[in-house]
């Protein structure tokens, strides 16, 4: 879905710039991991036979079990989320069923800098893998500037040592469509979970509330949390993807304004139709006692009512 001609791109860009700068200021006091302390950690995926690598942080001489988390902020340019995305599933594409979004900055320098800084992951992987693999980090272009795709598979193919199956989150599988893939060995694990939130201002505080994936619209300003995963592909290459685990709605005002503008264009306001009051009688006899006739109708209704009651 396109942002459309009614979307205030300049306003959204400026709002995104301010939002990213505010998040940077908030994180200055937070504990950050130096690039020198980041190492590549091979993931032990029990439900998959594919090799995967993630980033982990060093604490002294040991690797902290928590992976290095990333936070990205941008404007939603494309959405592929439940329930619309899974309303008509193809039974032969279970391995590619993905919840994903695409972020753009609409020319925001803060957004471009944020994405370019993530390329440091390529250097870290290259040092770890040496000449064995060549990492590929693809950041495309959309709407004239950089874009980032963030995704997470709905299902995992279970092999010899299946992971624990977990229930789907609120609004993710309302039609119970994924049950058909369980006989094929596909399950929903903790690695497939994406949590959806919207941030609300309450008494000067920003509070998170869980929401359905169907809440999100193209044009929303969002925060995506997740990790970078690398895995080998053909010809000795390593593909890197941003696997999201949290999507937060921060600002929906620009998408709502665009929707209202489109609605006004296709449904312009119309003048209310003037109705003329028409008499019950085509012609009134001058000798007719209208008041008496009305009294007769009134008495008739009362008599009828009494007859039913009696």
Model-derived regions: residue spans:
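OB-fold ssDNA-binding interfaces and closely related basic DNA-contact patches used
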Residues: 1-180, 235-283, 294-310
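Extended serine/threonine-enriched, polar tracts that run as long, contiguous segments within proteins
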Residues: 173-247
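Acidic, serine/threonine-rich low-complexity intrinsically disordered regions
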Residues: 289-293
